[in-house]
């Protein structure tokens, strides 16, 4: 639940910034406002809300900036997750444990759609930015509770 609240709070920034009217909404790359990723994600990541609110019903789009060596242990989401690689290399796989040898790699422009409740993991070897779209309310549940960064001090 804390992960949902943290993602929702971040998306509020984007919603307020882009909800000036009901017309087309655009934002240049240089205007994207980055902040620390919520506690449900490993430290070192940065998140930017582009549209919608992941904590509420409806569609949303966020970006996640990850440094080289960033690892997100096996987890799942209650809804479909759609990921597009903006820059760098995004490594991902399905299963109950992070498996670097069994992972697939996507470069800029690459796309993956992960079905709801599918255990998966991700990692980077170089600095990487991905765009994540989905339907809320969005959340994250780690396969191994000990991997959940929000539960660590």
Kindly label every feature range from the protein language model.
Residues 18-60, 145-153:
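A short, N-terminal "cap"/entry segment at the start of jelly-roll beta-barrel domains
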């Amino acid at each position: 639940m804390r992960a949902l609240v943290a993602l929702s709070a971040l998306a509020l920034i984007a919603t307020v910034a882009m909800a000036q009217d009901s017309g087309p909404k655009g934002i240049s790359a240089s205007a994207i406002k980055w902040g620390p990723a919520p506690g449900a994600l490993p430290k070192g990541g940065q998140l930017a809300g582009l549209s919608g609110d992941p904590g509420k019903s409806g569609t949303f789009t966020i970006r996640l900036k990850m440094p080289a060596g960033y690892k997100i242990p096996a987890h799942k989401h209650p809804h479909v997750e759609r990921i597009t690689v903006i820059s760098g290399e995004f490594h991902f796989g399905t299963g109950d444990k992070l498996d670097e040898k069994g992972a697939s790699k996507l470069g800029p422009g690459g796309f993956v759609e992960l079905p709801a409740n599918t255990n998966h993991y991700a990692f980077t070897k170089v600095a990487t930015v991905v765009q994540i779209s989905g339907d809320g309310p969005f959340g994250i549940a780690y396969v191994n509770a000990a991997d959940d960064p929000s539960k660590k001090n």
